[in-house]
């Protein structure tokens, strides 16, 4: 007989198995977060309490790699409510000591040390797998992974060391028991994990999270030794005899440190009525901020040796895991709304029958992308399980009952590109154009130019960024409702556009499409835009998305900057005549600049009067090419003169790569970029200077960036020192511009053959 509840359970079981393989065995990227996974398991347990989904945690590795673990690595029962916490605490005597450890979000493993007299220690390493079978990853120890210091193991098999040096920490029974073991085996459970600092410094631009980084190296046939050196083995449990306890947790931590490993952060608490899920949640949030590693919960253990139970396939009773969980609810989909992004991508929003989660009424959730809607058959009538935790956007945990085929509605005018659907119409809709313009202005910090205001400007005929930047305020103020826009918003917008760097303007225009924002664009060397190696982008991306449209993007950026400066001058002086120091550092062409004849580029020639020969145009335009940073020679050919251009000078800060630590300064970043330098968010091998707010000597603890600079002998400058150097270089450039302006060419025109 068909049982719909049993069918639902089997569907969710397949989803759980897929998630287990991705998370524990590194088969692809994780398909759901830890919270989504826990909610899925809870719901499956409600459907089938006898299914055992809560006791089986992990995934069996492939048969070719699986081995039986030397010691079972059982999971932990989870506590989520105060009622569950109270029931667990009733099992222990009052004033019992509790150990509260960080629950690290890494790759769980088991290290087995075999120690014998007069023999080098033998170390084996295993992944947890499903708790019974795992994978032998001992080979990683030959590629740079460290789980301890070898020289310490000699002391562990030295009976004198145990009796004299460590005797004050161990009881006589433990020492006697250890000495009688013919072959001494130490089992240490721990976590392979990368510190948050190292991940943010070196790997955040290449990997989704630290766990993906470690999992990928563990499952690689040829792991990267440099990455393995950054992976820490953090121990949290030590067993010497699988049948009996041998030491207290204080001694356990001492032994961890003696073998050269830093144990997991642990706090000791007395069991009392004041301990609650609320106090644990507060403590967890504090540890998430302070911990060296990513953590996803707490492990709470009773510190009592008499409770020791031989490791088996059952979850321990004296230890539980505490996590902050979001609530879940079942609801029905009413319809799917498709909205266009600024990049012409359709983004789905799923509307549902309103339900209450954590005291908040939820009526819609994110649909992720087109493939998610299509594959999961989400449409009118679909029954879904949703979740919400804290301020996280509500989303679907699982689809309990899919919609009928005819109710799964996708955009009719769309085309598939990967997992997304893109608009494929002949004309760009109003929705996309407005979002593009809003993104431009908000990216540059222009106040007041949001969706409603920009939409009204669009309806009034201002349908491009250029149209708004170049708007005539006298005409705009005559349109009903646009007085404040013309008098206040536009002038402040011109200031922001005028002072923006070329990279910021390109990013604001979304010039190279979605996925290539300011962080990646900043890595493009404007002096060599055709270079195929750009940090953060593949060679294919540069070849197909950057270089083919570089000149067009550059021309548009030049025009916008020139237009904004002209508007500001017009507002201040009533004239749009460019000033002598108005040349923008990335190749601007003023309206009164005429292109001069050149073999490789267009040089600028300011025309103040007709040429001596009476020609209408003082310069003869020739074939143009926009390689504006090429340093080849140029000449201005007229009927009466030929002006040879000097070679282009190197920008004063070209080759300087700065990183700021403990402060941000957008204006200073723009000034450095204008002088040819770069400012990065994180340190890497290209950084030349690290900038601090204070002058040396520097107080400990050092920031990660400062420590990197000191370890690698980089320049460390104070903010005051950097600002003085930038000011000096800017003053030099101003003097050079004035000098060039006073040096007329033989044809009676002031020729600017050198760009700053």
Swiss-Prot record:
GO terms for molecular function: DNA ligase (NAD+) activity. It holds the Pfam family DNA_ligase_OB. Residues 610-630 are annotated as: Disordered. The keyword Ligase applies. GO terms for biological process: DNA repair; DNA replication. The active site is at 103 (n6-amp-lysine intermediate). Residues 648-742 form the BRCT domain. Keywords: DNA replication, Ligase, NAD. It comes from the Viruses. It catalyses: NAD(+) + (deoxyribonucleotide)n-3'-hydroxyl + 5'-phospho-(deoxyribonucleotide)m = (deoxyribonucleotide)n+m + AMP + beta-nicotinamide D-nucleotide. Belongs to the NAD-dependent DNA ligase family. Catalyzes the formation of phosphodiester linkages between 5'-phosphoryl and 3'-hydroxyl groups in double-stranded DNA using NAD as a coenzyme and as the energy source for the reaction. This is Putative DNA ligase 052L. It comes from Invertebrate iridescent virus 3 (IIV-3).
């Amino acid at each position: 007989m068909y049982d719909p509840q049993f069918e639902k359970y089997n569907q969710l079981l397949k989803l759980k198995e897929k998630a287990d393989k991705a998370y524990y065995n590194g088969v692809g990227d994780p398909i759901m977060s830890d919270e989504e996974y826990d909610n899925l398991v809870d719901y499956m347990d409600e459907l089938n309490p006898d299914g055992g989904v809560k006791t089986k945690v992990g995934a069996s590795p492939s048969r070719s790699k699986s081995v039986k673990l030397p010691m079972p690595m059982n999971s932990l029962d989870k506590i989520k409510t105060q009622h569950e916490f109270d029931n667990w605490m009733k099992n222990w005597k009052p004033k019992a000591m509790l150990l509260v450890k960080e629950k690290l979000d890494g790759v769980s493993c088991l290290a087995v040390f075999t120690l014998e007299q007069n023999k080098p220690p033998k170390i084996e390493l295993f992944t947890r797998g499903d708790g019974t079978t795992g994978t032998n990853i001992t080979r990683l120890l030959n590629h740079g992974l460290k789980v301890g210091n070898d020289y310490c193991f000699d002391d562990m098999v030295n009976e004198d060391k145990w009796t004299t040096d460590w005797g004050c920490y161990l009881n006589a029974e433990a020492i006697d028991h250890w000495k009688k073991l013919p072959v001494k085996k130490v089992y240490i459970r721990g976590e392979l994990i990368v510190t948050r600092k190292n991940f943010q410094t070196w790997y955040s631009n290449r990997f989704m999270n630290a766990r993906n980084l470690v999992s990928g190296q563990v499952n690689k046939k040829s792991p990267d030794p440099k990455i393995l050196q950054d992976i820490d083995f953090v121990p949290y449990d030590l067993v010497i005899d699988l049948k009996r306890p041998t030491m207290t947790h204080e001694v356990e931590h001492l032994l961890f440190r003696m073998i050269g490993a830093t144990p997991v952060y642990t706090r000791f608490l007395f069991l009392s009525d004041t301990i609650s899920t609320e106090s644990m949640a507060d403590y967890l949030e504090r540890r998430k901020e302070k911990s060296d590693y990513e953590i996803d919960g707490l492990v709470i253990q009773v510190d009592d040796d008499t409770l020791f139970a031989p490791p088996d396939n059952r979850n321990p009773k004296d230890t539980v895991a505490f996590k902050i969980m979001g609530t879940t609810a079942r609801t029905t989909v009413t319809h799917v709304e498709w909205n266009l992004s600024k990049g012409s991508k359709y983004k789905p929003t799923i509307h549902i029958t309103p339900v209450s989660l954590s005291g908040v009424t939820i009526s819609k959730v994110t649909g992720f992308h087109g493939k998610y809607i299509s594959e999961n058959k989400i449409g009118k009538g679909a029954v879904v399980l949703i979740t919400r935790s804290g301020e996280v956007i509500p989303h679907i945990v699982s689809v309990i009952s899919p919609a009928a085929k005819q109710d799964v509605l996708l955009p009719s005018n769309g085309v598939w590109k990967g997992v997304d659907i893109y608009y494929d119409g002949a004309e760009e809709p109003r929705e996309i154009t407005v979002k593009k313009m809003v993104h431009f202005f908000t990216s540059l910090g222009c106040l007041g130019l949001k969706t409603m205001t920009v939409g009204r400007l669009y309806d009034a005929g201002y349908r491009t960024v250029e149209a708004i930047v170049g708007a005539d305020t006298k005409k705009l103020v005559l349109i009903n409702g646009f007085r404040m826009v013309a008098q206040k918003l536009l002038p402040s917008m011109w200031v922001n556009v005028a002072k923006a760097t070329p990279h910021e303007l390109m990013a604001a225009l979304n010039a190279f499409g979605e996925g290539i924002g300011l962080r990646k664009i900043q890595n493009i060397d404007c002096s060599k835009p055709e270079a195929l190696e750009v940090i953060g982008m593949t060679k294919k991306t540069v070849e197909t998305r950057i270089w083919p449209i570089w000149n067009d993007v550059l021309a548009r950026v030049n025009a916008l900057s020139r237009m904004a400066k002209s508007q500001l001058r017009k507002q201040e002086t009533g004239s749009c005549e460019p000033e002598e120091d108005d040349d923008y550092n990335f190749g601007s062409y003023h309206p009164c600049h005429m292109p001069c004849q050149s073999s490789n580029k267009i040089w600028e020639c300011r025309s103040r009067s007709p040429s001596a020969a009476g020609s209408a145009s003082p310069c003869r335009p020739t074939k143009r090419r926009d390689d504006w940073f090429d340093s080849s020679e140029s000449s201005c050919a007229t009927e009466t003169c030929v002006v040879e251009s000097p070679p282009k000078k190197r920008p004063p800060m070209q080759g300087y790569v700065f990183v700021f630590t403990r402060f941000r300064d957008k204006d200073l970043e723009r000034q450095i970029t204008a002088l040819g330098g770069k400012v990065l968010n994180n340190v890497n091998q290209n950084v030349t200077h690290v900038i601090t707010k204070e002058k040396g000597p520097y107080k400990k603890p050092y920031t990660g960036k400062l420590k990197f600079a000191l370890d690698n002998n980089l320049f460390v400058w104070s903010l005051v020192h950097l600002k003085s150097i930038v000011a000096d270089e800017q003053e030099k450039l101003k003097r050079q511009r004035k000098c060039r302006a006073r040096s007329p060419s033989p044809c009676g025109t002031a020729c600017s053959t050198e760009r700053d």
